[in-house]
Swiss-Prot record:
This is Indole-3-glycerol phosphate synthase. Its EC number is 4.1.1.48. NCBIfam families: PRK00278.1-6, PRK00278.2-4. GO terms for molecular function: indole-3-glycerol-phosphate synthase activity; phosphoribosylanthranilate isomerase activity. It comes from Magnetococcus marinus (strain ATCC BAA-1437 / JCM 17883 / MC-1). It catalyses: 1-(2-carboxyphenylamino)-1-deoxy-D-ribulose 5-phosphate + H(+) = (1S,2R)-1-C-(indol-3-yl)glycerol 3-phosphate + CO2 + H2O. GO terms for biological process: L-tryptophan biosynthetic process. Belongs to the TrpC family. It holds the Pfam family IGPS. Pathway: Amino-acid biosynthesis; L-tryptophan biosynthesis; L-tryptophan from chorismate: step 4/5. The gene is trpC. Keywords: Amino-acid biosynthesis, Aromatic amino acid biosynthesis, Decarboxylase, Lyase, Tryptophan biosynthesis. InterPro entries: Aldolase_TIM (IPR013785), Indole-3-glycerol_P_synth (IPR045186), Indole-3-glycerol_P_synth_dom (IPR013798), RibuloseP-bd_barrel (IPR011060). It is an enzyme of class 4 (lyase).
Length: 268
């Protein structure tokens, strides 16, 4: 069993427990009190149309492949990290909510959404409509759909549920088959994960290959393995101006400063 299968097995157990604690109908009631959605897709599309880099900066404490990423001796303050990202040029924020494998938590997303005027993505492994409603109740402006764990009809149902709640959808692919499936969705946001989620091997060439095969009107978003301004410049040459970056920003303990350096900006 690879790591992705383990994660999805855990998610099935997690969702079953949560549905037993709070019904989907009760969650929908909570949605009424959630802050209104901010334009996640618009924040990225508007920058890309102007030839400007749009970064989804990720609040990421750890991962299955790297263990703890954010330095252990520093206080963990997700809202402050997200605000530092915003101040240093992030277009959007991504927040991991998976506890078991990525050291995330729903409360991190809630804290970020309450404190930061920036669209927020719930980064998790979604497969059930319950998780979509849950994302909106937490204040998410967008959700991630990973085609490696979803069949096309399932992804379409989740996308429709998200849109009904006013959220945008970022669909993530890693190969040609997944891209073909993703083209069946309506969202313009196409994330290309340079990291193979089954082996965790990273190759930035994946972004070049798949972006070239995308339908017109889709926005390629390069994810994982982006470490230097040169990486971004190479992708810019191929017409890619949108990125999801986390690990390389979090590792040094000053995520906002690391983002500013990556974007060639003055650190705020």
């Amino acid at each position: 069993m690879d790591i992705l299968q383990k994660i999805m097995q855990q998610k099935a157990q997690e969702v079953a427990i949560r549905r037993g604690q709070v019904s989907e109908a009760a969650l929908l009631q909570r949605v009424k009190y959630a802050p209104p959605t901010q334009g996640f897709a618009h924040a990225l599309l508007s920058r890309a149309q102007q030839g400007q880099n749009g970064v989804i900066a990720e609040v990421k404490r750890g991962s299955p492949s790297k263990g703890r990423i954010y330095p252990e001796h520093l206080a963990w303050q997700p809202a402050q990290i997200a605000e530092s990202y915003r101040a240093n040029g992030a277009a959007c924020i991504s927040c991991l909510t998976d506890e078991t494998f990525f050291m995330g938590h729903d409360a991190f997303l809630q804290a970020i959404r309450a404190a930061v005027a920036c669209p927020v993505l719930r980064k998790d492994f979604l497969y059930h409509s319950y998780q979509v409603v849950e994302a909106r109740s937490l204040g998410a402006d967008a959700i991630l759909l990973i085609m490696a764990v979803l069949e096309t009809p399932q992804a379409q149902e989740l996308e429709a549920a998200a849109r009904e709640l006013g959220m945008d959808v970022l669909v993530e692919v890693h190969d040609e088959r997944e891209l073909e499936q993703a083209h069946e969705l309506k969202t313009p946001l196409m994330g290309v994960n340079n990291r193979n989620l089954k082996t965790f091997v990273t190759d930035i060439e994946t972004s070049f290959r798949l972006a070239a095969r995308m339908e017109k009107g889709r926005l390629a978003i390069s994810e994982s393995g982006l470490n230097t301004p040169e990486d971004l410049a190479r992708l810019n040459e191929a017409g890619i101006f949108s990125f999801l970056i986390g690990e390389s920003l979090m590792r040094g303990g000053e995520p906002g400063g690391a983002l500013a350096q990556l974007l060639g900006r003055e650190v705020v």
